[in-house]
Amino acid sequence: ELLKTVRVIKFLYQSNPPPRPEGTRQARRNRRRRWRARQRQIQSLSGWILSTFLGRSAEPVPLQLPPLERLTLDCNEDCGTSGTQGVGSPQILVESPTVLESGTKE
């Protein structure tokens, strides 16, 4: 059921390709305006399809976060190296973050 719904929504988006960049400025502007209006219609239609056929809303469920007082940044000497891992010599982390765990396994 989910795959069928996704295929229908994908077909709707594919049936509205972006406008061609040719013609006068006014013609291009009109084409973009009409394209954006169609995109909005497709977006609302796909939300309706999701809520009707799958019983869920198109909006994501808000993530429950802890209070700001309990959030801390635990930054030690390895700060700033996460973006450069795998570049140059291999680095050994003392404590591998959970987010990067799958990317650091070899």
Swiss-Prot record:
Pfam families: REV (PF00424). It comes from the Viruses. GO terms for cellular component: host cell cytoplasm; host cell nucleolus. Gene3D superfamilies: 6.10.140.630. Residues 26-36 have a biased composition (Basic residues). GO terms for biological process: mRNA transport. Residues 8-16 are annotated as: Homomultimerization. This is Protein Rev. The RNA-binding motif binds to the RRE, a 240 bp stem-and-loop structure present in incompletely spliced viral pre-mRNAs. This region also contains the NLS which mediates nuclear localization via KPNB1 binding and, when the N-terminal sequence is present, nucleolar targeting. These overlapping functions prevent Rev bound to RRE from undesirable return to the nucleus. When Rev binds the RRE, the NLS becomes masked while the NES remains accessible. The leucine-rich NES mediates binding to human XPO1. It is found in: Host nucleus, Host nucleolus; Host cytoplasm. A motif (Nuclear export signal and binding to XPO1) lies at residues 63-74. The gene is rev. InterPro entries: REV_protein. The modification Phosphoserine is found at residues 82, 89. Keywords: AIDS, Host cytoplasm, Host nucleus, Host-virus interaction, Methylation, mRNA transport, Phosphoprotein, RNA-binding, Transport. Homomultimer; when bound to the RRE. Multimeric assembly is essential for activity and may involve XPO1. Binds to human KPNB1, XPO1, TNPO1, RANBP5 and IPO7. Interacts with the viral Integrase. Interacts with human KHDRBS1. Interacts with human NAP1; this interaction decreases Rev multimerization and stimulates its activity. Interacts with human DEAD-box helicases DDX3 and DDX24; these interactions may serve for viral RNA export to the cytoplasm and packaging, respectively. Its main location: host cell. It comes from Human immunodeficiency virus type 1 group M subtype B (isolate BRVA) (HIV-1). One of its GO terms (molecular function) is DNA-binding transcription factor activity. The lineage of its organism: Viruses, Riboviria, Pararnavirae, Artverviricota, Revtraviricetes.
